[in-house]
């Protein structure tokens, strides 16, 4: 089962994306140019900063693990009386794969238009730099990891403690950590069974040393 979006009941709160363990459901805001090629339902985006733009919750049905967290958290529209997300058989939602591809490849992030640290809704307009991990369906850790990557991922350094996070973050040959449009993203390393706090301190000291060396080269 995967979630199906009912635009009529959506209040654009973005809570569904906030709780998703795998970043497989996201809000997209489309400008006039991006709307031209979109062949799916959209809503008028709420907020003055999104004037003339449209809003859509898009599910990546091929990466969704069907935990149902998004449908559970969805408050729906009190005036309409129903949730905006309901779980449906995957076979009935396969057409959404093309819609996801369009959004992912053609719709640019609008996070620069809002303060992504102001509230839950705004935070989810930021592109996740942690996505499609090998974590279990409904994982309670990865939504936090994903959120940190949205807020600080372009300059994030992770000293990972051994546990579930070392498995879903570093399963060769892939990694759930990714980069933004500028090529910036988290730096991740795992110390296995060592003291990860000390390991992280070493990363910080090394970073400071490299920055100091760059400054020295520029001034000498």
Model-found features: residue ranges?
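A glycine-rich phosphate-binding loop feature that marks nucleotide/adenosyl-phosphate handling sites
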Residues: 88-92, 161-169
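Ferredoxin-like iron-sulfur electron-transfer modules
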Residues: 1-12, 29-66, 86-94, 123-133
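N-terminal amphipathic, basic-rich helices that act as targeting or association modules
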Residues: 134-162, 170
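Conserved small/polar residues in nucleotide/adenosyl-binding loops
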Residues: 218-219
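Iron-sulfur cluster-binding cysteine motifs and their immediate structural context
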Residues: 15-35, 60, 69-92, 115, ...
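Short secondary-structure boundary/capping segments
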Residues: 34-36, 92-94, 100-104, 172-181
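Metallocofactor- and cofactor-centric catalytic cores in central/energy metabolism, strongly enriched
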Residues: 138-139, 166-167, 173, 178, ...
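An acidic-aromatic substrate-binding cleft motif
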Residues: 110, 116-143
